[in-house]
């Protein structure tokens, strides 16, 4: 059953179900439950939390509860690019190993799409799309690819970059921002363009970005995660 309510609300719980024979029919028979297929093996289901906000593990099964994931601790060391030989490989044009015709996916805290390291030589974005799961803005634009949040495609990102170049507000076109900087750092290391003496591993690659929303409070409570610690749901990833 498709979801006709806001699955991002705090009073909606999420769980992961293996698509065994009869699982789909069992979900459809439940009242107030909606589901969406993650792939050929897994189903993500959503329903209203009980009033006490406690998960009934005995009936649901621990494996159905989305696990929480955090960010890499500490600062990334970009000197590793040289140590793994990435810069030496890029210097050999005959290898054509700059990531051209490759699409790299990032599921993280978002990306600073205005940063020059994500643009090509003409100043256009190399980002093909950004799915901002945190975007709750009402819009008339159809969400073709996602059940919540907002998907921005390449032409919209280029429009935002052009606005920024003209002294306008780019975020009126593409509102997504990487307030943490973690996603931007990871993307720049792996796919940063040649900029001010810096280059990533695959400067010719295109990027596909997901900005994850923070996990719901009931899962933080269940796993004893502090409120000030970034945590992301397995079902969103």
Predicted regions and their residues:
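Autoinhibitory propeptides
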Residues: 1-103, 110-126
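Subtilisin-like serine protease catalytic core
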Residues: 91-233
């Amino acid at each position: 059953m498709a979801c006709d309510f806001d699955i991002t609300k705090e009073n909606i719980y999420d769980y992961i179900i293996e698509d065994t024979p009869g699982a789909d029919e069992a979900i459809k028979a439940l009242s107030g439950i909606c589901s969406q297929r993650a792939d050929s093996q897994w189903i993500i289901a959503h329903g209203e939390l009980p009033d006490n906000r406690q998960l009934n593990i005995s009936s649901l099964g621990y494996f159905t509860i989305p696990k929480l994931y955090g960010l890499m601790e500490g600062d990334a060391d970009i000197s590793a690019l040289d140590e793994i030989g990435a810069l030496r490989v890029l210097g050999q044009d005959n290898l054509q190993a700059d990531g051209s015709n490759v699409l790299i996916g990032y599921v993280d805290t978002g990306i600073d799409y205005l940063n020059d390291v994500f643009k090509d030589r003409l100043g256009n974005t190399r980002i093909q799309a950004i799915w901002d799961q945190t975007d709750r803005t009402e819009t008339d634009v159809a969400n073709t690819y996602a059940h919540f949040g907002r998907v921005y495609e390449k032409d919209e990102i280029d429009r935002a970059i052009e606005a920024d170049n003209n002294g306008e507000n780019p975020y009126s076109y593409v509102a997504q921002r990487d307030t943490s900087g973690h996603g931007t750092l990871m993307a720049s290391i792996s796919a940063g363009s040649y900029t001010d003496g810096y280059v990533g591993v695959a400067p010719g690659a295109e990027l596909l970005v997901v900005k994850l929303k923070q996990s719901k409070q009931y899962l933080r409570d269940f796993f004893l995660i502090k409120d000030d610690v970034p945590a992301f749901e397995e079902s969103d990833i």
